[in-house]
């Protein structure tokens, strides 16, 4: 989260699930819906989770005590990638990509996207 705040990243794209075939593949680095986690001087509040066909969009409220800023960060998580394979169709992935591009156009700026 320190990197997110330092670079003012507004969008995170995640293509993996936390578990694949029962094995942990990714550390869950965000709080559950409507919960807050604190990472040093940074508080992360999961303000909203919206489920679409094939992906989730989470909206986080980030507060940096040290930098005295608050910011909104959006996380897109693709949830239809099958274990040890490739998606049967790309329609959900393409729809998520279009959502990300639209959001980037709306929020503007030149901050990097985290993938």
From Swiss-Prot:
Q: Where does substrate bind?
A: 83
Top EC class, one word:
hydrolase
Report if keyword Hydrolase is assigned: yes
Instruction: List the catalytic activities from the record.
Output: O-phospho-L-tyrosyl-[protein] + H2O = L-tyrosyl-[protein] + phosphate
The record's listing under Pfam families reads: Y_phosphatase
Q: List the InterPro entries.
A: Prot-tyrosine_phosphatase-like, Protein-Tyr_Phosphatase, PTP_cat
Q: What are its E.C. numbers?
A: 3.1.3.48
Q: Which UniProt keywords apply?
A: Hydrolase, Protein phosphatase
Record-annotated Tyrosine-protein phosphatase domain positions: 1-115
Q: Which PROSITE patterns match?
A: TYR_PHOSPHATASE_PTP
Single GO MF descriptor: protein tyrosine phosphatase activity
Q: Does the keyword NAD apply?
A: no
Task: Tell me which family the UniProt entry assigns to this protein.
Answer: Belongs to the protein-tyrosine phosphatase family.
- The protein's name in its UniProt record: Tyrosine-protein phosphatase 21
Which source organism?
Answer: Styela plicata
Organism lineage reads as: Eukaryota, Metazoa, Chordata, Tunicata, Ascidiacea
Protein's gene = STY-21
